[in-house]
């Protein structure tokens, strides 16, 4: 059997357990002829055990015969940081206005969750990557240079 040819790769961010055919999912998949309800049911089934509403980046590979496969990534670092310090949004002026403080332990937890998607050599490098994301959101970082 010949290997199927990938026709398109679609990258979306979908809330866990809340995939439905409305925008942005419907139009993005529809223009490539993908079975939208098939994707929604499959995605919702795979994200059933996750926190409802958590944004999940997903990469959908569409093949020439209109079939598809998808790969779920880890939630965005900004979402995990906001969840850890219990705030709704980042600072509008991150260099001057701080919205909270995050500890090294919290950063290590986030780094362990994000590890499969990060290119860091070790957990310390991953912590520094997450710390940089936190600083750019206006979060004070404790325990990391």
Swiss-Prot record:
Record's signal peptide: none
Which Pfam families does this UniProt record tie to the protein?
Ribosomal_L11 (PF00298), Ribosomal_L11_N (PF03946)
Keyword flag Repeat: no
What are the record keywords, sorted?
Answer: Methylation, Ribonucleoprotein, Ribosomal protein, RNA-binding, rRNA-binding
Offer a single GO CC term for the protein.
Answer: cytosolic large ribosomal subunit
Q: Name one GO biological process term.
A: translation
Post-translational modification summary for this protein: One or more lysine residues are methylated.
MF terms from GO for this chain are: large ribosomal subunit rRNA binding; structural constituent of ribosome
- SMART domains linked to this entry: RL11 (SM00649)
**UniProt cross-references to HAMAP family, sorted A to Z:** Ribosomal_uL11 (MF_00736)
Task: Please describe what this protein does.
Answer: Forms part of the ribosomal stalk which helps the ribosome interact with GTP-bound translation factors.
Q: Record's family?
A: Belongs to the universal ribosomal protein uL11 family.
Give the matching PANTHER family. Answer: 60S RIBOSOMAL PROTEIN L12 (PTHR11661), LARGE RIBOSOMAL SUBUNIT PROTEIN UL11M (PTHR11661:SF1)
Q: How does it assemble?
A: Part of the ribosomal stalk of the 50S ribosomal subunit. Interacts with L10 and the large rRNA to form the base of the stalk. L10 forms an elongated spine to which L12 dimers bind in a sequential fashion forming a multimeric L10(L12)X complex.
Entry protein name: Large ribosomal subunit protein uL11
This protein's species is: Francisella philomiragia subsp. philomiragia (strain ATCC 25017 / CCUG 19701 / FSC 153 / O#319-036)
Classification from the root reads: Bacteria, Pseudomonadati, Pseudomonadota, Gammaproteobacteria, Thiotrichales
């Amino acid at each position: 059997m010949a290997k199927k040819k990938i026709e398109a790769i679609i990258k979306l961010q979908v809330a866990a357990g809340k995939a439905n055919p409305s925008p942005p999912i419907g139009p993005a998949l529809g223009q490539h002829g993908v079975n939208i309800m098939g994707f929604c049911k499959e995605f919702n089934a795979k994200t059933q055990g996750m926190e409802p509403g958590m944004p999940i980046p997903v990469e959908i590979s569409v093949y020439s015969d209109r079939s598809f496969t998808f790969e779920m990534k880890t939630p965005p670092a900004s979402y995990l940081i906001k969840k850890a310090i219990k705030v709704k949004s980042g600072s509008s002026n991150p260099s001057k206005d701080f919205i909270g403080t995050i500890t090294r332990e919290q950063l290590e937890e986030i780094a362990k969750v994000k590890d499969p998607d990060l290119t860091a050599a070790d957990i310390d490098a991953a912590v520094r990557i997450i710390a940089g994301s936190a600083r750019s959101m206006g979060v004070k970082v404790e325990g990391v240079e």
